[in-house]
Amino acid sequence: MSDIIAYKVDGEIVDTQSFKSLKNVKNAEEIYFDNSEDALKVIRHSCAHLMAQAILALYPNAKFFVGPAIEDGFYYDFRVTKENGEKLGKEDLQAIEKKMKEFIDAKEEIAKICSTKSEIANEFKNDDLKQEVLKRIPDGEVSVYKQGDFKDICRGPHVPNTKFLRFFKLTRVAGAYLGGDEKREMLTRIYGTAFADKENLNEYLRILEEAKKRDHRIIGNEMKLFTFDDQIGAGLPVWLPNGARMRSKLEKILFGVHRRRGYEPVRGPEILKADAWKISGHYTNYKENMYFTKIDEQEYGIKPMNCVGHIKVYQSEIRSYRDLPLKFFEYGVVHRHEKSGVMHGLFRVREFTQDDAHIFCMPSQIKENVLEILDFVDKIMKNFGFSYEMEISTKPEKAIGDDKVWEIATNALKEALDENGFKYGIDEGGGAFYGPKIDIKITDALKRKWQCGTIQVDFNLPSRFDLGYIDENNERKQPVMLHRAILGSFERFIGILIEHTAGELPFFIAPTGVSIIPINDAHLNYAKEVQKALANLEVDSEILSKNETLNKRIRTAEKGRVPMILVLGDNEVKNRSVALRDRRARAQSNLSLDEFLEFVKNKLNEVNF
């Protein structure tokens, strides 16, 4: 049996240092030193402190802000300058790791000391960053954790001894604004990870290296899909011809699926009066994420979501219960303010397009429509090779509507999943400000989880906009509004798909499906004939006929990760055939042109949405 490093009491993780002082504990669950989710939270949080201890030993002038455990590891934000006046860089990580290992070998006890806030403030009176931390802590008892000469204000939990922190790795150095405020100073942030054993650490590091090779920003540049430009602005992607072709194919496929499932296309404006956002609650609850402007002295907000426009479509006619459910969808371009430090390629941008839909239905229709959406999600994700899991996110601290309405909406989601045997987790407080939601989290080839699709049940916006329908008794009733996205956003989903496939995109959305390479000019007319036949199948192709060697042109096609390469020479022209290199199957073959076109048709028909 491995060592106990903490306990779980009433759903909260309590370290061994704190557990000793608890009284009348009835249901305490041991947390052992292993790679369970709870154990890793404790190990990684403690490793953040260990890193800070090492940094302080190497750089006595260092000041520390916060160092939490995060999903895949930990980080610490701090201020330090080296003797040459520079900030720490990646080249300094090895020395920090070496010092951390010294403290691990020393097997230092980690002690918890509790005191009053004023006493702690006095102890750290010369540390401006710790004073910033104290501002965020309510009055009362404050805890400090101590290991060796290092002390830090912290709630815990932590392992009891540094000996439990042997399997760690510092991964990267970044900058982070103090408290996430872009107007404050830039601190240094070092990220790391930790596990309970060497095997899991090595596997994580292997995946990390593979992720670098699959970085969608690098592959996107190699495949000429998209770019970013400082003159345009951060978080504003520019789609190049290859990327625009791929994206349009994805949009076209989804458009057809929506129509077959009974959705009506609509389109709302991208800029709305602030009055509309005040009614919806966005002005109060989401304003910091929005962009505003003035037109003729009237304040307008650029939409961060599409829901208000779809509400206005609903209100354009008198609705009957016979009309419901009404399903409106839109590829809606939205803008949200993201801090510069969190933007990352296509994953976090300021302008993006949602595959957004809103379903207006009667309360009795909630379950059937939620299940229809889940079936939609299942079809899409399986066609792209993703597995997924679901999580119900409940009422956040900042929300509109009363608790009773939230309870009804949350229970409607739970019942839809429970009655059909779906497994799901609970994310307490993770809902949208207007309603609870089901988050769809997909798992990629590197076993990373990404939140993409979402289903939200909303009683609040229909009430705020006084939506209604006439029921079978000729009485006016309020509909329920289901907010729904399958991909989440095209930008984010495409970024995930690029990394999931390492750029080897499915044939049906590949920007260029076939590269045609005539060996010399005598074969060019036949190449054009093949290209025309492919165009009739709606397959994009390119002819690589530059005055370059055959091998160089083949390498160009391979660098672009084109699924199929055709080499055309004298034999192919004479026999009306093609020499096919199938990149995805890693196979070469010779086919007649008719056989090849039939092969392409079959490839296109392999997916069924």
From Swiss-Prot:
Coiled coil location: none
Cofactor binding description: Binds 1 zinc ion per subunit.
GO cellular component, as recorded: cytosol
Keyword Ligase listed: yes
SMART domains found in the cross-reference section: tRNA_SAD
Annotated PROSITE patterns: AA_TRNA_LIGASE_II
Record's subcellular location: Cytoplasm
Cofactor(s) listed: Zn(2+)
Ranges for region Catalytic: 215-506
GO terms of biological process kind: threonyl-tRNA aminoacylation
The keyword NADP is assigned to this record: no
Entry's EC annotation: 6.1.1.3
Function of the molecule: Catalyzes the attachment of threonine to tRNA(Thr) in a two-step reaction: L-threonine is first activated by ATP to form Thr-AMP and then transferred to the acceptor end of tRNA(Thr). Also edits incorrectly charged L-seryl-tRNA(Thr).
Protein family membership: Belongs to the class-II aminoacyl-tRNA synthetase family.
Protein name as catalogued: Threonine--tRNA ligase
Biological source species: Campylobacter hominis (strain ATCC BAA-381 / DSM 21671 / CCUG 45161 / LMG 19568 / NCTC 13146 / CH001A)
